[in-house]
Amino acid sequence: LFRSDLSLVLDQSVTLQAIQRVAEQTEKAILKNVSVFDVYVGKNLGEGKKSYSVSFILQDENQTLTDKVIDATMDRLITRFEKELNAIIRK
């Protein structure tokens, strides 16, 4: 079981359900849970923007997850969030 967190800056119209849908479509095999642990709205994000801090739980039922697999999974998720939800990843 592995947890990885991302902070995504999104338009205020983007819902948690949209984040979950994109994540599940991207990583059905090893993604076990997607949950938001913080929502932030502030002037420094820009007009009409909000930041979701999202936790992803990854687990492979058949083998131990390697750093390489985890990194590739998170890269795919980030790419999909950027393309489909116009997300900006907060560092």
How should these model regions be labeled?
Residues 2-91:
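A carboxyl-terminal module marker
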